[in-house]
C-alpha cells in the first residue's frame, strides 16, 4: 500500500485475498440448503477470505465457516429494510462493527448494517443505519475494489 506508512506513521498490516483451498460455495450450498445467491457461491468457490485491515476502517469477507456459522447462529439471519423483514447471509464486516449482508433472494442486494441490535435472529438498526450499498453481490465486489483504490489514493471518505 503506497504511502500508507507516511500517512499513518506505522507500516501496513497484512492485507490479503486468500484463494480457496476447497470449494467454499459448495459448503455454503450444502449447509444452507441450496438457497444462496449464485454470485456468493461463485465467490467462495474461488476465495476463502478477504482481510483488508488497512483499507479505511477495514474490510473483512469470509471465511466460509464464519459465514455459515453466523447464519446458523442467527447473527443475524434477517434484517429490517424499510419496514420489511428480509432473509440475509452475513458475508463480512468492517473494522468498526458494521456488517455486510446479502439478501438470500436474487438479485441479492447487499446492505451495510451499522449499530444494529439482534433479537431472535432479526437485526434492527436505527433509521439511516441500514443502507443498500450494491444492487447485487458482483456490484458489491466492484464497490469494494473501488474502496481499495480510493484508500490507496489517500481520499478522505470511504465509499461505504
Protein language model annotation of sequence segments:
Residues 1-99, 152-160:
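A surface-exposed partner-binding patch
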Amino acid at each position: 500500500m503506497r504511502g500508507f506508512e507516511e500517512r499513518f506513521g506505522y507500516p501496513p498490516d497484512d492485507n490479503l485475498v486468500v484463494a480457496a483451498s476447497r470449494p467454499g460455495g459448495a459448503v455454503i450450498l450444502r449447509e444452507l440448503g441450496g438457497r444462496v445467491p449464485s454470485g456468493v457461491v461463485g465467490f467462495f468457490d474461488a476465495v476463502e477470505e478477504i482481510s483488508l485491515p488497512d483499507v479505511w476502517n477495514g474490510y473483512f469477507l469470509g471465511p466460509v465457516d464464519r459465514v455459515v456459522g453466523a447464519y446458523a447462529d442467527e447473527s443475524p439471519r434477517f434484517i429490517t429494510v424499510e419496514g420489511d423483514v428480509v432473509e440475509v447471509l452475513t458475508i463480512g464486516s468492517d473494522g468498526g462493527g458494521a456488517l455486510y449482508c446479502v439478501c438470500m433472494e436474487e438479485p441479492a442486494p447487499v446492505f451495510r448494517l451499522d449499530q444494529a441490535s439482534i433479537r431472535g435472529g432479526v437485526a434492527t438498526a436505527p433509521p439511516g443505519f441500514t443502507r443498500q450499498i450494491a444492487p447485487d453481490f458482483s456490484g458489491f465486489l466492484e464497490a469494494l475494489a473501488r474502496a481499495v483504490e480510493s484508500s490507496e489514493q489517500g481520499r478522505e471518505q470511504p465509499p461505504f
